[in-house]
Amino acid sequence: MEQSFLPIRCALISVSDKTGIFSLAKNLIKHKVKLITTSGTYKYLLEKGIFSTSVSEYINHPEIINGRVKTLHPKIHGGILSNNKNINENKNLNIKKIDMVITNFYPFKKKVKKENIKIENIIDNIDIGGVALARSAAKNYKYVTVVVNINQYSKLSSEMDKNSGSVSFKTRFYFSTLAFQYSYSYDKEIFNYFNKIYFKEIELKKNLKNKKFPELFSISFSKKEDVLYGENYHQKAAFYTDPVIHPGTVPFSIQRQGKKLSYNNIVDSDIAINCVMNFSEIACVIVKHSTPCGVSSGKNIIDAYRSAYYSDPDSAFGGIISFNRPLTIEAAEFIINKQFVEIIIAPVIEKDALLTLKSKSKIIVLECGYLSKNFLLNFKKVNCGLLLQDSDNKILKEKDIKIVSKRQPSKLEIESSIFIWKIIKFIKSNAIIYGKNKRTLGIGSGQTSRIFSTRIAAYKAIDQGFSLKGSVMASDAFFPFRDSIDFASKFGVSCIIQPGGSINDDKIISAVDENNMSMIFTNTRQFSH
């Protein structure tokens, strides 16, 4: 039966992060605890006037392989794993009972975050001995106290002071749980590194090409920060990030000013960055409630912003504005004089622009960098499961399209069609976009009927005073019936871009021809659920 309170007589200390260890060691000595320490910890404490027994002295064997093997020894693990049943065995082998293990591991995660670091340096930061110590001690929680979290040092000291140098069973069990969690997270970080970085996703690319996904999929994220609340005020939330962070993403972004990002801010900013980075030409995207409400290209970012804003100024109020070019002082002044804005995002924020924005200190300003890579995987959590798919990174080019109508679209119609097609995958299905001259005129999203999205997008455009004559229309999926074609024709739409693939394609094409319109097939559906 476990001891309710365990007197601590001997503690093994092996820590990479030595924060707080001096104060804890002093408290242990106050309670007459014998200290056994590994070389780095031994030297650190000795310099501060605390004497201990080195592991090498205790086991009568030097550290070997440049310190890679220090504590992997029967006298260490025999002392940690022993219980009341094997006291005599340990006594005959001159193995002392170790009542406490204080350890933390090599800083693997910090090394991984550094760019261009060699694999050899990463390997040297994979802890073996510390992990073994923590697991041995956690396994034997009935007879050993294990501490892996520097934030628990004060709790440990307080408990020992209160209980004359002893630790309660409840605390030992809690600390063992933390140790297993720490070890688990550490191993996942290592796995993710080898899976994502060392193999540089070659195997993943090959497997995805062959439509193969791993039998076991494991992910590990680290908490960056708590956010004020979740999607709604009554929900709690936190923001976690990938072990490796790339430019052109929200986690990579530097917040130059403004209040703390909310849950919804992060979601909307991610969509805004992803959408605007699809374009090689100068572009601006305005997002509201996870949906682009205005997107435009232009000869400069002010021109692009102006057109995006006037696509739907009502929805743009309090929205997220994202650019794929540096934010200039002229653009910053134009925006703050035009509308109330929640967030402004650009790959670079020029100094003068930031000085101008400081007059509106509540505006969140994110400098996100330029997108450096396409991400291979996309996943969505469902209750008790995870859906995994390869990311939709396909960018439509003119050589990929198929013109299926009698009327041939003009060069400008093709360019505008491809432009709005790049946006459609960021609009919730059923999605319809009207556009012209590389800008959106009206967006219909999230309707369970395609004809309703077609109508909503048109009414939005008309409400802003736009004429749809000579405009283009994009649909994220095929048209099951001709009703949307006939509706668009009434407003003068001249070209439609859609995936095709309906059993009624022939009827749809006939409707297009009857209305003297052009139709482009992309052969790629762009659902967003």
Curated annotation (Swiss-Prot):
Entry annotated with the keyword Hydrolase: yes
Pathway note: Purine metabolism; IMP biosynthesis via de novo pathway; 5-formamido-1-(5-phospho-D-ribosyl)imidazole-4-carboxamide from 5-amino-1-(5-phospho-D-ribosyl)imidazole-4-carboxamide (10-formyl THF route): step 1/1; Purine metabolism; IMP biosynthesis via de novo pathway; IMP from 5-formamido-1-(5-phospho-D-ribosyl)imidazole-4-carboxamide: step 1/1
Chain ranges of the MGS-like domain: 1-148
Keyword Cell membrane in record: no
GO cellular component: a single term: cytosol
Matching SMART domains: AICARFT_IMPCHas (SM00798), MGS (SM00851)
Source organism superkingdom: Bacteria
Signal peptide segment: none
Pfam families: AICARFT_IMPCHas (PF01808), MGS (PF02142)
GO molecular function: IMP cyclohydrolase activity; phosphoribosylaminoimidazolecarboxamide formyltransferase activity
Domain remark text: The IMP cyclohydrolase activity resides in the N-terminal region.
UniProt name for this protein: Bifunctional purine biosynthesis protein PurH
